[in-house]
Design a protein with these regions (language model features):
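Hydrophobic, aromatic-rich transmembrane alpha-helices
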Residues: 390-393, 573-601
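Acceptor/aglycone-binding surface of glycosyltransferases and processive sugar-polymer synthases
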Residues: 65-79, 84, 96-174, 201-219
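A conserved acidic beta->alpha catalytic loop
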Residues: 43-51, 92
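Conserved donor nucleotide-binding strand/loop of the catalytic core
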Residues: 35-40, 51-79
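Cell-envelope/extracellular polymer assembly enzymes that use nucleotide-activated donors
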Residues: 5-7, 38
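Transmembrane alpha-helix segments characteristic
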Residues: 408-410, 598-622
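Membrane-lumen/periplasm interface segments of specific transmembrane helices
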Residues: 501-585
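Short, acidic, metal-binding catalytic loop of nucleotide-sugar glycosyltransferases
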Residues: 25-35
Length: 666
């Protein structure tokens, strides 16, 4: 077999309408120039007849199931045998039949990059937004990487194999085009440019390029992607945090422009509901007349006290940014919060107590809803949203044949009373964030984009701090991370994977803490030192306070007892608790007697560490866990889900099944 001189690599995703012409044109070029070459079509997950057509035309097909322009090209480069490589899109926008000039230039440099703007750019071949974006990003890249390349995004290029082997590619998407030139400049490779025609593709072809999404990926690489990992993460996180703080404050100011009068009718209906139900304080939503089931199911507590504060703050907004940061509510200690809210509506009491350490982000949702709905109706809306998100997680798992995980998640959600979280504005926010982050995390794992998980969890920490009332915020870390770990279980978790999980947890914690610090800092700058003193007092109160004369060990005992006894079905009484204990012990005995012989213990240990996050929270916020056990117990959903995942993975169910069959025969 003759030595291959030139490899022509074409990334392909559903290009059955254009692929044949591109291959034939490339073959024509190789014949005319008498070049010993090969044509490689990298099938990037096509669902049409692209692969079949490529084989029929004599091209070599290489499969790359992981989606991404960069992934496809990197796979094609690895498969190529030629001393020289030309890459080009197989959508008929580039002319493979006339590459003589490129071939000639390749003999005297390391890389040849096409320039579509100095040749024939066919009308309609490039949209106006695409044209502006390419020029702007290319201009920015030239200055960032000290380059003379004019068109950073041209899809047809030629290079020596030796030059490619010097470049350490990391990117997988469209930003690969920018990375290739940036790395070449960094390595000091000799780059030449060549004007190339750019034509319209066939009519009706769906473009693969998304101007906003892919433009942002190019911009991200230009600004921070080429940096060392630490600085890359630092600037990305800084950008996300600053954007989030400004957007969050801006949205609150925007909803503060809704006139109070527009909220008065539905706020009054809400107050009537609170006062008629239980004097505007707290009461379990579900009760029982049967002693064996327990008279009060505290896991269903409706915290009207907190919700009345919420509505009072919403009503106190006067359109100014200061009112947003102060987050004042009406409070006279002799009256219930429902009665205080009624007096505020009647004009008998002004909002007089600051809650600036939070400036409640969830009012971005609740305040506009109050314009059209009463609080009872808002509870229903939240119920539909939360139930929909929980079902979406279960159905997504089932769609990917993860039935066991779907069942475990459903059990954990029921045990922690997740479907009932919507009965109180205070609790609902966590489960909305949990649902959204879980769905995105699972999608990233399924699409093999796990590198984005740390940034997702950083955003999760920011968002839950912005929206939540310190209820069960760790669920937005633990549940999505446990689901991601389950989906990644088939890949043996090496130490690098364990460190990656720790990085995810660190990023979530950073997002949460930094958002809170940003809130406090803004409150301090706007309101003065009193805001910061309030923060310090609340931290001490919720963590190390031992009100009632109890020591820390007694408080810990109360926290454990009250939180665990609020879980379903333990909350139904001692008999239910005993049955639950028997089931748990039975599962542990199964794991001890029928363990799998080959087991990824690092994966198991990692799941257990993530599962214990709510217990760590209990130790840190001890007084808070005792005082507010009726909602903090929901954080234990992570412990339940992690326990079920570990049991499912550790137990050798085939051995259990065989043992049961033997006993039945006997």
């Amino acid at each position: 077999m003759a030595e291959v001189e030139l490899s022509i690599v074409m990334p392909c995703l559903n290009e059955e309408r254009t692929l044949k012409k591109c291959i034939k044109d490339a073959q024509s070029f190789l014949r005319r120039k008498n070049i010993s070459g090969e044509i490689i079509v990298v099938d990037n997950g096509s669902t049409d007849n692209s692969s079949k057509i490529a084989k029929q035309c004599g091209a070599r097909v290489v499969k790359e199931a992981r989606k991404g322009y960069g992934r496809a090209l990197r796979t094609g480069f690895e498969a190529a045998c030629g001393e020289y490589i030309i890459m080009g899109d197989c959508d008929c926008t580039y002319d493979f039949a006339h590459m003589t000039k490129m071939w000639r230039l390749m003999q005297s440099c390391d890389m040849v990059v096409g320039d579509r703007f100095k040749a024939n750019l066919e009308p309609g071949a490039m949209s106006l937004s695409h044209r502006i974006g390419v020029r702007a990003l290319s201009w920015l890249a030239r200055r960032r990487f000290h380059s003379k390349v004019y068109d950073y995004h041209c899809g047809i290029r030629g290079m020596r194999r030796a030059a490619i082997e010097k470049l350490e590619f990391r990117t997988t998407g469209m930003e690969f085009a920018t990375e290739m030139i940036a790395l070449a400049e960094l390595k000091g490779l000799k780059i030449k440019q060549l004007p190339v025609d750019y034509r319209k593709s066939v009519k009706g072809r769906r473009p693969k390029l998304n101007t906003i999404r892919d433009g942002f990926r190019h911009l991200d690489y230009i600004l921070v992607g080429a940096m060392k990992p630490f600085w890359r993460d630092f600037w990305r996180l800084t950008g996300i945090l600053l954007t989030s703080v400004l957007a969050g404050l801006g949205l609150l100011w925007l909803v503060a422009q809704i006139p109070r009068e527009d909220l008065k009718e539905n706020t009054q209906k809400s107050v009537d509901y609170y006062l008629n139900y239980d004097s505007g304080e707290m009461k379990p939503y579900l009760t029982s007349d049967y002693e064996i089931l327990g008279k009060n199911l505290y896991g269903t507590m409706m915290d009207f006290y907190a919700d009345s504060i919420w509505l009072s703050i919403a009503y106190s907004y006067d359109g100014s940014l200061r009112s947003v940061i102060e987050s004042k509510y009406a409070n006279v200690k002799e009256d219930s919060m429902g009665e205080n809210l009624q007096k505020q509506l009647n004009g008998e009491l002004e909002a007089n107590e600051e809650y600036s350490r939070y400036w409640h982000g969830s009012l971005v949702i609740v305040r506009p809803l109050l314009k059209w709905f009463s609080v009872q109706q808002i509870y229903i809306i939240y119920g539909v949203v939360i139930t929909g998100l929980l079902l979406a997680i279960i159905l997504s798992l089932c769609k990917h044949r993860e039935f066991v995980a779907a069942g475990a998640f459903a059990v954990a959600a029921i045990v922690a009373g997740a479907p009932l979280a919507a009965i109180c504005l205070e609790y609902a926010q966590v489960f909305v964030v949990l649902g959204m982050v879980s769905l995105i995390a699972m999608r990233l794992v399924w699409r093999d984009k796990t590198k984005a998980l740390p940034y997702l969890f950083f955003c999760s920490g920011i968002l839950v701090n912005y929206l939540d009332f310190l209820t069960a915020e760790t669920l937005t870390l633990a549940i999505p991370l446990l689901l991601a770990l389950w989906l990644m279980r088939k890949q043996k978790l090496e130490m690098g994977g364990f460190k990656f999980v720790l990085k995810i947890m660190l990023f979530w914690a950073l997002g949460y803490v930094l958002m809170w610090l940003a809130k406090w800092l803004i409150a301090w700058l706007a309101l003065g030192g009193s805001a910061w003193q309030s923060v310090g007092a609340q931290i001490e109160k919720r963590s190390v306070s031992t009100e009632g004369g109890f020591n820390h060990f007694e408080m810990l005992g109360y926290a454990v007892d009250m939180n665990f006894s609020s879980l379903f079905p333990i909350c139904f009484g001692s008999w239910a608790g005993l049955i639950t204990a028997i089931v748990v012990c039975g599962l542990l005995l199964l794991a001890a007697k029928f363990p799998k012989k080959q087991l990824d213990w690092l994966w198991v240990s990692t799941v257990l560490i993530v599962s214990c996050v709510p217990l760590l929270r209990m130790l840190v916020l001890l007084e808070h866990e005792v005082r507010h056990f009726f909602f903090t117990y929901r954080a234990l959903m992570a412990l339940v889900l992690g326990f079920l995942f570990v049991i499912i993975r550790v137990v050798d169910w085939q051995r259990v099944k065989s043992c049961l069959k033997c006993k039945n025969r006997a």
